[in-house]
From Swiss-Prot:
EC number(s) on file: 3.6.5.n1
Family annotation (CDD domains): EF4_II, EF4_III, LepA, lepA_C
Enzyme type, top EC level: hydrolase
Pfam families: EFG_C, GTP_EFTU, GTP_EFTU_D2, LepA_C
GO molecular function, one term: translation elongation factor activity
Name of encoding gene: lepA
Protein name per the record: Elongation factor 4
C-alpha cells in the first residue's frame, strides 16, 4: 500500500488539465505516443468539442522512481460550477491534488472554490504553473498570486507546459515525494466510496470506487449503504486504458465494479460500498442527493415524437443520474416533460445530447427555479413550474432560492459588474483585492435571476475577464407573483412566469410588445394582455384585417354605408367569440431571448 498514490487535478476551465493528464499518461507509458488523441479521458464527443470535462474519470498509471515501482491513480474532475458535487466526491477519493494554473490567465474563481474543497479534505496541494511557453505568460506575477493564496514557498511551484511536455517528470516526482500514501486497514470491514458511474449497454452500470478500508473479492455480496440495495460483485478490477479484471482489491486501491445493475439511479455518487455479512460501522461522510437547481419544460416539435423523446430522455438518464424528469402537458405545446438540471450548462448539454445522440429537435420553455410556497395552514409546497402555483388567496408567502456568487475580475470592470448584479436584485457583500490586478466580489443574488442570461451578460461587460462561481445559501421569502399572458382573453400557460413584483410591470409590457410583433394578424382584433391574478397590468392590441365593405356604395347616402359597417362589426364580434389564436413556435423562443 505504501507504493500507491491517489491524486486529482484541479483547474479552471481551459487551464490545460486534460492536456496535462494526457502527458502524464504518455510519460508513464500507459499509452504510446501513437495511440494518443487529445483529451484522452474526455470520451464524450461533446466534451472534446467544448473542451470541458463533464463526467469524472479515473485511470491507473505505473511509474518507476529510484528503483521502486509505484501505482499512481489519477482521478479526473470536471471544472465547471454546475458539477461541483461530482468534483467534491472525486476530491474525497484522493490524498493529494495538482493545482494547475494557467501562467497567462492567473487564478480564477473556480480554481479557488475547488482548492477550498481540497483543503477541507486535507489534501496535499502541488501547485503547477502551466502554459509557461505562451508568449503572454506572466510566470513571476502568477507565482506571487499562488504564494499569496497557498502560503507555500516559491520553490514548491513546478513550472510546466503540458503542450510541450516541459516539467512532466518533475510533476511525477513531486506526486511520489510529497503526497502521502493511503492509510487504511486491509483486514477491517469493507468501506469504499463511489465517485462515478458509467452506463454500458452490455454490462449495465459500471461503478467506479476508491477503497478506504477492507478488501473486496470477485463474487462477494456487497451492498450500497444509502440506497440499501445489495448486489453480487460479478467483475472487479482496475482502470488502465481499458478495464483490467482482478481477483481482489484492497484498501487504497481505485477500481471498478460490475454487477449487472440496469438502473443508473441505484448508483449514487458519494455512496458507500460494504459487505452484506460484515458491514462497516458507518458510511463515509459527505453523501448528498444532488438536487436540481434549474427546471424547464422539454417538448417534441411534432407531437407524434413524444414516445421517441421519452426513450431518449430515459437513455440519457442512465448516464446522467442528476437529470430528473416528470410528465407535463401544456395547452400550447402539447405533451412533454418537465426536467430538472444542475444548472444552465447542464441544461444546454442535455439539449445538445438529445439533438446529437438521438436526433431529436426539441422546444425548451423558459427555465425557472424551484420555489417554496407556504400556505395559510403553514404547509410547505415545492413548486417547479408556474402552473403548479396555488391560488394567491391560499398563499401565505413564497420563498425563492438565494446564492452566494463569487466573481473574480479586473478592477476596471467593477462598476459595470456591480450595476449588473444590483439590476438582478443582488446585494454586494464583500470586495477583496487578491492582487492589484484582480478583485474578488461577493454578491448575494436570487438564483432565478442568474439562471437566465446572467453568465453571458457578465462575460460581455467584462470582455471575458470575469469568472463566476456560486453556492446555494437557502430559501428566503420574496415578493413574488405569477405573471400570466392572455391572448384573446385566454391564458397561454407556456408563457407564464413567476417573477418579482417590482419587475412584473416592465416584463409584462415587454412581453406584450414582443408578441404583438410576432403573432400574425387575424380577421378579428386580438388583445394581448399581461395579468397578475385578475388585474391586467399591460396590454397591446393586434388590429384586425378588414375588407372595405363600402367600396361599392356610390352616391352619398350615409345610412346605407352605416348599415354595411354595422353588419361587418357584428360579424367580427361573432368571429372573435369563437375564434382561437395559434401561437407560432418563434414566439416561445423569442420570449427566451427578451432583454
Amino acid at each position: 500500500m505504501k507504493n500507491i498514490r491517489n491524486f486529482c487535478i484541479i483547474a479552471h476551465i481551459d487551464h490545460g488539465k486534460s492536456t496535462l493528464a494526457d502527458r502524464l499518461l504518455e510519460a508513464t507509458g500507459t499509452i504510446s505516443g501513437k495511440a494518443s488523441q487529445d483529451q484522452l479521458l474526455d470520451n464524450m464527443d461533446l466534451e472534446r468539442e467544448r473542451g470541458i470535462t463533464i463526467k469524472s474519470h479515473a485511470i491507473q498509471m505505473r511509474y518507476t522512481f529510484k528503483g521502486t515501482d509505484y501505482v499512481l491513480n489519477l482521478i479526473d474532475t470536471p471544472g465547471h460550477v454546475d458539477f461541483s458535487y461530482e468534483v467534491s466526491r472525486s476530491i474525497a477519493a484522493c490524498e493529494g491534488a495538482l493545482l494547475v494554473i494557467d501562467a497567462s490567465q492567473g487564478i480564477e474563481a473556480q480554481t479557488i472554490s475547488n482548492l477550498y474543497l481540497a483543503l477541507e479534505h486535507d489534501l496535499t496541494i502541488i501547485p503547477v504553473l502551466n502554459k509557461i511557453d505562451l508568449p503572454g505568460a506572466m510566470p513571476e506575477e502568477v507565482k506571487d498570486q499562488i504564494v499569496d493564496l497557498l502560503g507555500c514557498d516559491r520553490e514548491d511551484i513546478i513550472p510546466a507546459s503540458a503542450k510541450q511536455g516541459i516539467g512532466i517528470e518533475d510533476i511525477l516526482q513531486a506526486i511520489i515525494e510529497r503526497i502521502s500514501p493511503p492509510t487504511g486497514l486491509v483486514d477491517a470491514p469493507l468501506q469504499a466510496m463511489i465517485f462515478d458511474s458509467v452506463y454500458n449497454s452490455f454490462k449495465g452500470v459500471e461503478v467506479y470506487f476508491r477503497i478506504f478500508n477492507g478488501t473486496i473479492k470477485q463474487g462477494d455480496q456487497v451492498k450500497f449503504v444509502n440506497t440499501g440495495k445489495s448486489y453480487e460483485a460479478d467483475e472487479i478490477g482496475v482502470l488502465r486504458l481499458g478495464q483490467i479484471p482482478q481477483e481482489s482489491l484492497s484498501a487504497g486501491y481505485v477500481g471498478y465494479l460490475i454487477s449487472g445493475i440496469k438502473n443508473a439511479r441505484e448508483v449514487k455518487v458519494g455512496d458507500t460500498i460494504t459487505h452484506v455479512n460484515n458491514p462497516c460501522k458507518e458510511a463515509i461522510k459527505g453523501f448528498e442527493d444532488v438536487k436540481p437547481m434549474v427546471y424547464a419544460g422539454i417538448y417534441p416539435v411534432e407531437s407524434n415524437e413524444y414516445e421517441e423523446l421519452r426513450t431518449a430522455i430515459e437513455k440519457l438518464q442512465l448516464n446522467d443520474a442528476s437529470l430528473v424528469w416528470t410528465h407535463e402537458s401544456s395547452a400550447a405545446l402539447g405533451i412533454g416533460f418537465r426536467c430538472g438540471f444542475l444548472g444552465m450548462l447542464h441544461m444546454e448539454i442535455v439539449q445538445e445530447r438529445l439533438e446529437r445522440e438521438f436526433d431529436m429537435t426539441v422546444i425548451t420553455t423558459v427555465p425557472s427555479v424551484q420555489f417554496h410556497v407556504i400556505d395559510k395552514q403553514g404547509d410547505l409546497h415545492e413548486v417547479n413550474a408556474p402552473s403548479e402555483l396555488p391560488d394567491p388567496n391560499l398563499i401565505d408567502e413564497i420563498q425563492e432560492p438565494f446564492i452566494r456568487a463569487q466573481i473574480i475580475t479586473k478592477p476596471e470592470f467593477i462598476g459595470n459588474i456591480i450595476k449588473l448584479c444590483v439590476d438582478k436584485r443582488g446585494a454586494l457583500q464583500n470586495q477583496t483585492y487578491l492582487t492589484p490586478e484582480r478583485v474578488e466580489l461577493t454578491f448575494k443574488l436570487p438564483l432565478a435571476e442568474v439562471v437566465f442570461d446572467f453568465f453571458d451578460k457578465l462575460k460581455t461587460i467584462s470582455k471575458g475577464y470575469a469568472s463566476l462561481d456560486y453556492e446555494l445559501l437557502g430559501f428566503e421569502a420574496s415578493k413574488l407573483v405569477k405573471l400570466d399572458i392572455l391572448l384573446n382573453e385566454e391564458k397561454i400557460d407556456a408563457l407564464s412566469a413567476i417573477v418579482h413584483r417590482d419587475k412584473a410591470y416592465e416584463l409584462g409590457k415587454k412581453l406584450c410588445a414582443k408578441l404583438k410583433e410576432l403573432l400574425p394578424k387575424q380577421m378579428f382584433e386580438i388583445p394581448i394582455q399581461a395579468a397578475i391574478g385578475t388585474k391586467v397590468i399591460a396590454r397591446e392590441t393586434i388590429k384586425a384585417m378588414r375588407k372595405n365593405v363600402i367600396a361599392k356604395c356610390y352616391g352619398g347616402d350615409i345610412s346605407r354605408k352605416r348599415k354595411l359597417l354595422e353588419k361587418q362589426k357584428k360579424g367580427k364580434k361573432r368571429m372573435r367569440q369563437i375564434g382561437s389564436v395559434e401561437v407560432p413556435q418563434e414566439a416561445f423562443l423569442a420570449v427566451l431571448k427578451l432583454e
